[in-house]
Amino acid sequence: MTELPVAPFERILKKVGAERVSRAAAEYLAEAFEEIALEIAKEAVDLAKHAKRKTVKVEDIKLALKK
């Protein structure tokens, strides 16, 4: 189960054209998003540590997204 709220994912699905969205579909999208976001965050933290920083910067996120 995801820690993220499901309503924003229902809105995203509707924004791209879904007329109706099941709760299960929105929850599944939220879980998938959370998994991807965690991987990006882990990579960004590693990049910040490698640069001997405690603060994760936008540049770390951008670089993590490229990997």
UniProtKB/Swiss-Prot annotation:
Keywords: Chromosome, Cytoplasm, DNA-binding, Plasmid. GO terms for molecular function: DNA binding; protein heterodimerization activity. One of its GO terms (cellular component) is chromosome. The keyword Signal does not apply. InterPro entries: Archaeal_histone_HMF (IPR050947), CBFA_NFYB_domain (IPR003958), Histone-fold (IPR009072), HmfB-like (IPR050004), TAF_TATA-bd_Histone-like_dom (IPR004823). It is found in: Cytoplasm; Chromosome. It holds the Pfam family CBFD_NFYB_HMF. It comes from the Archaea. Residues 20-22, 54-57 are annotated as: Interaction with DNA. The record marks K14 as: Interaction with DNA. Belongs to the archaeal histone HMF family. Homodimer or heterodimer with another histone. Dimers then assemble into higher oligomers, with the DNA wrapped around the protein core. NCBIfam families: archaea_histone (NF043032). Binds and compact DNA (95 to 150 base pairs) to form nucleosome-like structures that contain positive DNA supercoils. Increases the resistance of DNA to thermal denaturation (in vitro). This is Probable archaeal histone 4.
